[in-house]
From Swiss-Prot:
Keywords: Metal-binding, NAD, NADP, Oxidation, Oxidoreductase, Potassium
Disulfide-linked positions: none
Modified residues (Cysteine sulfenic acid (-SOH)): 286
The protein's enzyme class: oxidoreductase
Residues holding NAD(+): 150-152, 176-179, 230-233, 254, 286, 387
Biological processes, Gene Ontology terms: glycine betaine biosynthetic process from choline
Active site: 162 (charge relay system), 252 (proton acceptor), 286 (nucleophile), 464 (charge relay system)
Function: Involved in the biosynthesis of the osmoprotectant glycine betaine. Catalyzes the irreversible oxidation of betaine aldehyde to the corresponding acid.
Protein encoded by which gene: betB
InterPro entries xrefs: Ald_DH/histidinol_DH, Ald_DH_C, Ald_DH_CS_CYS, Ald_DH_CS_GLU, Ald_DH_N, Aldehyde_DH_dom, BADH
Cofactor binding, per record: Binds 2 potassium ions per subunit.
Protein name: Betaine aldehyde dehydrogenase
Length: 490
């Protein structure tokens, strides 16, 4: 593949060179080839983007709800028309198979934008009667300029999850994609402009997270930060946001989620769910159910079914129709995942399969790790306690409900959880005791536009998707109207 042209920043409706003079490279993780050199935004570029966003936001917010809705719907149409083009670029940048990016990444992002475009006319205030001569009414007004900071695992989907409610509510957004996967966010900016979004309402600033991201969190002209990433980075973002100007924050952070297989579960269904909860996107999904709790008496049979299904994983050419497993997103991340795997071996977990980098057959130059399953795991092991963000499943056995609930909740995380059982009374009883913000019964992983998603504990603050997220991008103004005679005590 030929190297792409140097990528610039997208500010005020068009591409512009970074003033910092700094660049970084984005890599195809399947082959190790450089895809493009990307310009990195500096502090002056953030200032330019904020000024542009402030101008554009005034124009955008002054439009009627239906005008804004039509523009966002045009962007939805453009996304769907260009699905294949965007999916191919996402595959090159992330290492996900085309079978995945073409069916999920752009499609689900467009769904969220369509959902919020439809909600714009329904964004309304309320009227509260006080007495015959007086009433209060409320208005939901935009925050102004907000910033989104994305993660590298779902680049365009995350950009849409953050920008859709923000723009629908009348805000402007400055989006910083991960430096690991920056390419499709720039294409999204082009699409928004083509759809008719006023200049400056959606700006994209590629850059190094510790620098560009910090400039955004510290900028007094930004009213809110929506961040997706790790817990440690999220705490820094939150601290900077509070110290600078008491910004509002939404945080979608890490997870170490439990998947509980009940003793009455269909083990074939349970194994299918566990595979999707661990190996989809090569395990690089924040909600993955990496702690798989299985009744002790059924563990051996469950292990057998998992190994059967691991045999159906097909790594290879990312553009081949039958490939369903790709490399990890980068070489540093691959090395980190391999270190976790070695810790599992060292701490006494029994390795059922994988446990190493994939070699040969075109894998040598990429960031490939074999699908890995550990069993006989215990709660204190590093692979059970810490988020790995790779294709590593840990199987743990349990004896009764009280035990498995206690152990499932014994984590600083609280992003997701799941239960597999045909007994819905039991399913609800278990789910209601689990400390997690996103839960599934007899399923895993679907996050439709209508469903609020977010975590408990260290897994985040606030929600993405759903009606409540649209409201979180507004501020409420209360107005009392007095129609009678005003009484003064002076």
């Amino acid at each position: 593949m030929s190297r792409m042209a140097e990528q610039q920043l997208y500010i005020n409706g068009g591409y512009t060179s970074a003033t910092s003079g700094r660049t970084f490279e984005t890599i195809n993780p399947a082959t190790g080839e450089v895809l493009a050199t990307v310009q990195a935004a500096g502090r002056e570029d953030v200032d330019r983007a904020v000024e542009s966003a402030q101008r554009g936001q005034k124009i955008w917010a002054a439009m009627t709800a239906m005008e804004r809705s039509r523009i966002l719907r045009r962007a939805v149409d453009l996304l769907r028309q260009r699905n294949d083009e965007l999916a191919r670029l996402e595959t090159l940048d992330t290492g996900k198979p085309l079978s995945e990016t073409a069916a999920v990444d752009i499609v689900t992002g467009a769904d969220v934008l369509e959902y919020y475009a439809g909600l714009i006319p329904a964004l309304e205030g309320s009227q509260i009667p006080l007495r015959d001569s007086s009433f209060v009414y409320t208005r939901r007004e935009p925050l102004g300029v907000v910033a989104g900071i994305g993660a590298w695992n779902y680049p365009i989907q995350i950009a849409l999850w953050k920008s859709a409610p923000a723009l629908a509510a009348g805000n402007a957004m400055i989006f910083k994609p991960s430096e690991v996967t920056p390419l499709t966010a720039l294409k999204l900016a082009e699409i928004y402009s083509e759809a008719g979004l006023p200049d400056g309402v959606f700006n994209v600033l590629p850059g190094i997270g510790a620098e560009t991201g910090q400039y955004l969190t510290e900028h007094p002209g930004i009213a809110k930060i929506s961040f997706t990433g790790g817990v440690a980075s999220g705490k820094k973002v939150m601290a900077n946001s509070a110290a600078s100007s008491l910004k509002e924050v939404t945080m979608e952070l890490g997870g170490k989620s439990p998947l509980i297989i009940a003793d009455d579960a269909d083990l074939d269904l349970a194994a299918d769910i566990a595979m999707m909860a661990n190996f989809y996107s090569s395990g690089q999904v924040c909600t993955n159910g990496t702690r798989v709790f299985v009744p002790a008496k059924q563990k051996a049979e469950f292990e057998h079914k998992i190994l059967e299904r691991v045999g159906r994983i097909r790594p290879g050419d990312l553009f081949a129709d039958d490939t369903n497993f790709g490399p990890l997103v980068s070489f540093p991340h691959r090395d980190n995942v391999l270190r976790y795997i070695e810790s599992g071996k060292r701490e006494g977990a029994r390795l059922l399969c994988g446990g190493e980098a994939l070699k040969g057959d075109g894998f040598d130059n990429g960031a490939w790790v074999a699908p890995t399953v550990f069993t006989d795991c215990s709660d204190e092991m590093t692979i059970v306690r810490e988020e790995i963000f790779g294709p590593v499943m840990s199987i743990l056995s349990y004896t009764d409900e009280a035990e498995v609930i206690r152990r499932a909740n014994a984590t600083e995380y609280g992003l997701a959880a799941g239960v597999v059982t045909p007994n819905l009374n039991r399913a609800h009883r278990l789910i209601h005791q689990l400390e997690a913000g996103i839960c599934w019964i007899n399923s895993w992983g679907e996050s439709p536009a209508e469903m609020p998603v977010g975590g408990y504990k260290h897994s985040g603050i606030g929600r993405e998707n759903g009606v409540m997220t649209l409201q979180s991008y507004t501020q409420v103004k209360s107005i009392q109207v007095e129609m009678g005679k005003f009484q003064s005590i002076f």
